[in-house]
Amino acid sequence: MTLYLDGETLTIEDIKSFLQQQSKIEIIDDALERVKKSRAVVERIIENEETVYGITTGFGLFSDVRIDPTQYNELQVNLIRSHACGLGEPFSKEVALVMMILRLNTLLKGHSGATLELVRQLQFFINERIIPIIPQQGSLGASGDLAPLSHLALALIGEGKVLYRGEEKDSDDVLRELNRQPLNLQAKEGLALINGTQAMTAQGVISYIEAEDLGYQSEWIAALTHQSLNGIIDAYRHDVHAVRNFQEQINVAARMRDWLEGSTLTTRQSEIRVQDAYTLRCIPQIHGASFQVFNYVKQQLEFEMNAANDNPLIFEEANETFVISGGNFHGQPIAFALDHLKLGVSELANVSERRLERLVNPQLNGDLPAFLSPEPGLQSGAMIMQYAAASLVSENKTLAHPASVDSITSSANQEDHVSMGTTAARHGYQIIENARRVLAIECVIALQAAELKGVEGLSPKTRRKYDEFRSIVPSITHDRQFHKDIEAVAQYLKQSIYQTTACH
């Protein structure tokens, strides 16, 4: 598959397909023409010695300092080196790759003044899977993701560290191996690379992809639990949900009916009890609300994926060109969205933990043994799996605190409000990892509960899932190191998203 970039129409589904199919990037001709035109404006500014931020002046508080024309290119290299202050563990390979795609896409809008050489260097790195090593910490998410994107830019100019074919190497060594020259930054280009929200947005895209998938995975896991507890099917009737009008809720109810169709373990209203606890009865309402959040996040991310978020921006209108210093680099819209994503995923984990508690609690699980123990008393069974899930959901509650309500001044109070969007993105992904493990715990426990109930009573669709996951997690016949089962299921759930990724 080839992914064609035009600066205007990139979608999350495009990114997902790109990651799964080891695609290549191509650039449409119209986008290249826009790049040429915007670069011509920069060249005229240089020729006329105009005063334009970041081209002929310094940065931040130094915006009033005029730069000698012989030092314009040096200014850009100095910018990248000094701003590469990222710290901590690196972003994943997928996030770093998507970061390059998004930065390339925004340059193709033709408002940044980049050269074709810069555009082609980004394309080369993407297609050759030369992955910059980009530390996660250090961005305030307001004057762009300056630190992370500077580490990306370092790789392009042959000064950074990269992953190439599974090995960490110096970028310069990889370029030499591939007979490729490091990028020689021209006026404006350092700024064009690092003024933007691509770190938070790239992590947000990966988080959205995995969060949406978790939402779907949580439904069949919940369906296993529902059957193991002889849950009441009536609560999922279409007419119940149609009168509330939330389409996502209606959709979840329909999928739950589909997962449970043909089961002999489900019950009807008043058959053994009048109504179920909320964690079973309200799955469409709870999960549906998470999908509402995911839809909002997707919309915001796709706007930003195709946005010009550089500064300054170059425009042409009625044969007139002008350069405007604005603030499109400010990450507030994405920070808000990613804080919402944290809430949506946290609730999937919260309700999952409460469901699995019902499976192991002898006061709530009907005729199932306490903690599903094969020999209660001598063997603890699933007791501490519930502890682990409780720990993870409690950690998520702390991580879900909104990063976007925080701000701190920087650059001598010139940049006096920041979004903290990249912090929201990082915390959001940790919540996703935690939530996946909570769902893995529910899966391990629900598999055992279904076995004790009699798998012949499962619906055909959930029986297939039971058989699939029993190949990963064997029956619990005695106490064992359950952390291995949990991690194996969590990894399998994640791999189902990225069957073949472009980075491996």
Curated annotation (Swiss-Prot):
It is found in: Cytoplasm. Its main location: cytoplasm. It catalyses: L-histidine = trans-urocanate + NH4(+). SUPFAM superfamilies: L-aspartase-like. One of its GO terms (molecular function) is histidine ammonia-lyase activity. Pfam families: Lyase_aromatic. It is an enzyme of class 4 (lyase). One of its GO terms (biological process) is L-histidine catabolic process to glutamate and formate. This is Histidine ammonia-lyase. It comes from Staphylococcus aureus (strain NCTC 8325 / PS 47). The lineage of its organism: Bacteria, Bacillati, Bacillota, Bacilli, Bacillales. The gene is hutH.
